[in-house]
Amino acid sequence: LRQSNNDMEVLLVERSSNSAFGDLYVFPGGKVDSEDDFSDKLSSHSDLNDVDCSKLLDVEGGGASFWVACIRECFEEVGVLLARNKDGSMIDLNNKDKDRFVDYRERLISNKISFLEICERENLFFETTNIVPFSHWITPDIETKRFDTRFFAAEMPKDQPTLHDGNELTNSLWITPKEAIKKAWNGEIKMILPTSKNLEQTFDFNSTNELISFYKDKRSSEIKSILPKFKKVDGKWEGRLPGDEGYE
């Protein structure tokens, strides 16, 4: 998320037609990898505590790896690094730090370096205070490929451009949530239900700071899991969300 004048904008990316969710506009992201569990190295790069993160997500352990995955995926997919130098100074990906981190990103995408190696070499400290759990969606059981997806909201750092990777992602845009929904309704962009519902969930907030502050200390129990259900009505599949009539 970023603040643009009086409007809050969200970053959407278009998936390649050759990838999962091809041609759809989605949020940057991906799966949690085993390398996202920094374990003994975590305190060197973050104020995250795995116990607290796990409580926030209502999981038994490994909660901090979700935040690490969020940071890593944003860097891989759109070149945004949600981190500072350990001395507190901002990383300038527009100018002085640009070439070095462009090289890191290319090597990370091609599996020639790990994200932990980058963090160790550059002595990075994650901007975790501005990354908050936002929603939790589970793929309905009628699908053969199912996902258990945690969505996070993160504030865009200053002095960083966004650049989609050009492989899995073919386009990216900053747009207000309401304008994105309008474009989807008009058929200008394609998106699936979790994306549109997450966008609608931002409508009650006037600024990025307001939204981040609201979700900062919410536990998973306050962020209800959303499992869409589908039933055939007159030979056609109809979807229901929790709270809709006929959901149970």
Locations of regions flagged by a protein language model:
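N-terminal leader/linker segments that precede catalytic domains of diphosphate-processing enzymes
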Residues: 1-248
